[in-house]
Amino acid sequence: MALFRGMWGVLRTLGRTGVEMCAGCGGRIPSPVSLICIPKCFSSLGNYPKKPMSSYLRFSTEQLPKFKAKHPDAKVSELIRKIAAMWRELPEAEKKVYEADFKAEWKVYKEAVSKYKEQLTPSQLMGLEKEARQKRLKKKAQIKRRELILLGKPKRPRSAYNIYVSESFQEAKDESAQGKLKLVNQAWKNLSHDEKQAYIQLAKDDRIRYDNEMKSWEEQMAEVGRSDLIRRSVKRPPGDISEN
């Protein structure tokens, strides 16, 4: 399982353009976003039909163990790149075999979904759709965060309070995380104005670091055609930089 979890992580780094897995891969490598299949409906009610793997993912899951056996010391990222290259060079006739399997399973899947929904009450169906929307939004946000991490977006600046917490949390004498945070929070409130000024200055320095790194990063994004990630305007949060 760890091997395939690693595979999923690397697959999302292979490129931005491509067709979505859920629509079938064709000859192009899926994008980081499309590599994560988000079920149109998923419910905690259980027994929801499992969505079939795309042609490319099916090929990848077949090839990864073989590559791992041949190259036991190689990183998963290196193996995935080799598999991606192998897929690109795969004859169209062989790709069509994978695509045909996907289409056949997709048809069975859609029929199973229809039968599953027929068994639900109106209230259960509404709950299913609501849950699906929430999961899609949550997954979309997760994918966006992961993409920004992969693209090296600078970490946001920390407030004076957050810097103090990161320095003091482990030293707090309490076994529970909640207890530690409570102690650290009280200790912050008890700091004198002069003591807090040191952390406020660190926060200001971190803001300068962030602004400089963001300027450089956005220039890089413009160069690689990702202007959609560039801020239209820089908005500073209201309030003192020391606020938590």
Swiss-Prot record:
Residues 49-117, 154-218 bind DNA. It comes from the Eukaryota. The modification Phosphothreonine is found at T121. InterPro entries: HMG_box_dom, HMG_box_dom_sf, HMGB. One of its GO terms (molecular function) is transcription cis-regulatory region binding. Phosphorylation by PKA within the HMG box 1 impairs DNA binding and promotes degradation by the AAA+ Lon protease. One of its GO terms (biological process) is regulation of transcription by RNA polymerase II. The keyword Transit peptide applies. Keywords: Activator, DNA-binding, Mitochondrion, Mitochondrion nucleoid, Nucleus, Phosphoprotein, Repeat, Transcription, Transcription regulation, Transit peptide. The modification N6-succinyllysine is found at K66. Gene3D superfamilies: High mobility group box domain. It holds the Pfam family HMG_box. The modification Phosphoserine is found at S54, S55, S60, S159, S192. Signal peptide: none annotated. The record marks L57, L181 as: Intercalates between bases and promotes DNA bending. The mitochondrial isoform is widely expressed while the nuclear isoform is testis-specific. Binds DNA via its HMG boxes. When bound to the mitochondrial light strand promoter, bends DNA into a U-turn shape, each HMG box bending the DNA by 90 degrees. Monomer; binds DNA as a monomer. Homodimer. Component of the mitochondrial transcription initiation complex, composed at least of TFB2M, TFAM and POLRMT. In this complex TFAM recruits POLRMT to the promoter whereas TFB2M induces structural changes in POLRMT to enable promoter opening and trapping of the DNA non-template strand. Upon metabolic stress, forms a complex composed of FOXO3, SIRT3, TFAM and POLRMT. Interacts with TFB1M and TFB2M. Interacts with CLPX; this enhances DNA-binding. This is Transcription factor A, mitochondrial. It comes from Rattus norvegicus. The gene is Tfam.
